[in-house]
Amino acid sequence: MFQKQILDWYQKDGRKDLPWQKNINPYRVWVSEVMLQQTQVSTVLPYYKKFMSSFPTIQKLAAAPQDIVMQHWSGLGYYSRARNLHRTAKYLTDNSDGIFPNEIDELMKLPGIGKTTAGAIKSLGFNQRGPILDGNVKRVLSRYHMIKGWYGNSKTNDELWFYAEKHTPFTSIREYTQAIMDIGATVCKKNNPKCSSCP
């Protein structure tokens, strides 16, 4: 029931025109997910477009000098994200012809990729089942299941991961993942949530 409500909402109201939703592949998803860490979509959009214009493939990113990569990141903040992108691009290009692994554990061995980013690459990039738990999803799940407690608390976080795993479907994976993030970003907002629009 939860998944159906989320997917029905997405078909009607979800965001489907973001640049990383076009020509989908693990590389494009990975860059977008790293840029979106701690950063709003509206801020990321121009950076993503410029970054992809200069580095349309992981091989192009790997071959670029680090200072050029950092110039493309200038203004986005959290600069270790850009350094990790470059390191991972070089590693994958050197060791696997630029091909991403599609298993969570293997993805998490790469610089700057945690459990949620790995889940996003798997679900959005490969369209394979991979739960995610970013800030938006935490908010949706904690309100839906009435989970109290600080997200940084390990018990609270474990409970949220339990529900993230439980609710992630085996079909329509890419759509569900995008949908639950969208609901958290546009409806179940931190401040002034639009509860009347909640599916």
Regions found by a protein language model. Give the residues of each.
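Catalytic cores of DNA base-excision repair glycosylases
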Residues: F2-S196
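Cys/His-coordinated zinc-binding microdomains
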Residues: P199
